[in-house]
Amino acid sequence: MAYQMASLKIEMKEVVHVKPSKPTPSIVLPLSALEHRPYPDSIWPIVHVYQSPSNGQLDPAFVLKQALSKALVYYYPLAGKLVKQPNGKVAINCNNDGVPFLEAIANCELSSLNYLDDHDIRIAKQLVFDFHPQQDENEYPHPVSFKLTKFQCGGFTIGMSTSHIVCDGWGACKFFHAIVELASGKSEPFLKPVWERERLIGSITTQPMPNPMDETTAAVSPFLPATDVMYELFKVDKESIRRLKMSLMKEISCNESMEQSFTTFESLAAYVWRSRARALNLNNEGKTLLVFSVQVRQHMSPPLSDGYYGTAITEGQVVLTMKELNEKPLSDIVKLVKESKNVAFTGDFIKKTIDTLESNPENFNVEEGPGATLALSDWKHLGFMPNVDFGWKEPINMVPAPCNMFEYEGLCIFLSPSNHDPSMEGGVRVFISLPSVAMPKFKEEMEALKVITP
């Protein structure tokens, strides 16, 4: 039986600032060009869900704080503060301010919340740190913060919020893994972090990346702007993904002599983009944009060090009119996603992205009409699940929690299945936000995945 939101009570203790366990350098570190995006206060929050440990004598809050303190010796910039420099760019002041850490106690068992597998956003928001002190215009939130919530069953959640310009998903995962290794008894993390931001400094350019659409050509939805935005989590099982890919191959074989393979990301990205556009009832002649993050660590020349934990992403982009998106064979749209992803991996594209952000980060903004842009992020392969074990059991689930980065109607995240639902092995969870009035149509589109004829 689902737990009633009105009955959920969370008692919070005093906030503490966890500092490195040993002295660390006191310096100001500049960020890379890829971290100069025009959203320096965007936070990347996730909730890790753990069942009751077999050794009930261990206090997870104590263990996590001790391990965090040790990890910050290696990741000491994360114990500092983001500040704006005189040149307008953001840097990290390594002032040993510490990482905000909040311990809380919930009045229910995790099983009553279905281990967050239903992903009630109202609950998830209560499990991450909501720390917004008064700041002047030249200062930003802490690079990272934690909230550990204990439940009556002995299980607990770890809410980790990370500044999106300091760490991308891969970087945040490396940091979390270091904490886990130290919590489980290791004397040091296996992978030593490196700063290496100087590898990603660009040249001033007068030819920024072209804008794929502007506000005069962007599609519009009759449902936007909206005050009532919903967040839903859709489960796409392995069989539905197989049927989708088979149907795409069938389309190609009917129209081309040469077959082509598509990844799960490429196939689902195209399908979800089209489904969302239909749900929003975008106007036919307006343009709609799919933009997705592309991780380029191994595509640099030479590749970035394994210990690099900063932001190292470019963005793939596909733009079509709503009429084209709605009427083209889905396989054609998937090909465009694949081609855009491959372009984003190239050295020329990476350099142009870096140069544009170095010259004028504001040029990187994408103009959009209400609902015209879908921002897609793939979290399936970050490495948070399932081998993140504090010496107890591995996490049973990991979910995003909305904040200033997520509270708009143009977001979609692909997630790995939770360990709570064995039937979803090999599947994908699709997290999306839409106006409430558009969600029924999107649900209908997602249900259609189950009956696609290969």
From Swiss-Prot:
Subunit structure: Monomer.
InterPro entries: CAT-like_dom_sf, Plant_acyltransferase
Signal peptide start-end: none
Upper lineage: Eukaryota, Viridiplantae, Streptophyta, Embryophyta, Tracheophyta
Pfam family, one: Transferase
Name of the protein this chain belongs to: Inactive tetrahydroanabasine acetyltransferase pauper allele
Family label: Belongs to the plant acyltransferase family.
Disulfide-linked positions: none
Superkingdom in the source lineage: Eukaryota
Applications (biotechnology): Disrupting the production of quinolizidine type antinutritional alkaloids (QAs) by selecting inactive tetrahydroanabasine acetyltransferase variants is a potential kick-start for the domestication of novel legume crops.
